[in-house]
A protein has these predicted regions:
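Secreted/periplasmic proteins that engage bacterial cell-wall peptidoglycan
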Residues: 31-113, 117-119
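Residue-level detector of functional hotspots within protein domains
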Residues: 7-12, 21-24, 77, 86, ...
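N-terminal module-boundary/linker segments of secreted carbohydrate-active enzymes
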Residues: 1-64, 194-196, 205-224
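Domain-level detector of nuclease and nuclease-like folds
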Residues: 95-224
Length: 224
């Protein structure tokens, strides 16, 4: 299958998350073979006007690394070094409910990681392999698909989809998490597996009226 054009990522319109889920194609996972995070989705968090400068987002292409943009959006009590670098802040982790005090440093920064809600390995297996490299880089740096999260706890997720991993129920984030996954798969024309659809339907069925997030939703849009 030929690579799709760089402009394939569609703009999404707000509507029912359950309705959008019903429109996603259902297929088995493709093979993970050939997947290489850097070669296929670009290097993580590089600076400047390149691929890792929050593409497709309000406030993106601002010269700041994607990681700093997401930290600034999701943390409170943020302190900056210069215009971009987040030196410290507080994360109320949406996936575990824990409060984490973030301090930038070689040993301390991994306490907070940037989680792709649709894991890049999963994206590769469900259609991203056929996307052009620029669109895959956009996916990897799209704020719609990214959230700051507890680093060690996020290790458990790996490349699982919603049928294999979800945020802790007590944290109250599952509805938003799954709705964001549906939005990302809609935007980038990715498919879901039958088990994934069952898991997503179960979650969204418990939060009827959940609106599909868009690039301008308050939980997605970057801070200016």
């Amino acid at each position: 299958m030929p690579a799709r054009s760089a402009g394939v990522a569609r703009s999404i319109s707000s509507g029912s998350a359950l309705g959008a889920l019903a429109k996603l194609a259902v297929k088995p996972d493709g093979p993970i073979s050939g997947y290489d995070r850097i070669a296929d989705f670009g290097a993580a968090w590089t600076d400047g006007q390149g691929a890792s400068d929050c593409q497709g987002a309000s406030g993106g292409h601002n010269g700041c690394e994607t990681r700093d943009d997401i930290l600034r959006r999701d943390l409170t009590e943020v302190k900056l070094e210069g215009r971009c670098e987040v030196e410290s802040g507080v994360l109320k982790d949406p996936c575990t409910g824990r409060t984490i005090r973030f301090t930038r440093g070689r040993k301390t920064s991994p306490a907070v990681r940037i989680d792709p809600m649709v894991a890049l390995g999963n994206a590769w297996q469900t259609g991203a392999k056929a996307l052009s490299k620029p669109v895959r880089e956009q996916l990897a740096n799209d704020p719609l698909n990214l959230t700051a999260a507890d680093g060690p706890a996020n290790d458990d997720k790996g490349d699982d989809d919603a049928s294999g991993w979800l945020p802790q129920a007590a944290a109250g984030f599952r509805c938003e998490y799954v709705a964001r996954q549906v939005a990302v798969k809609t935007k980038y024309k990715l498919w879901i597996t039958s088990a994934e659809k069952i898991a997503m339907s179960r979650i969204l069925g418990g939060c009827r009226g959940r609106v599909l997030p868009t690039e301008s939703s308050h939980e997605v849009a970057l801070k200016s």
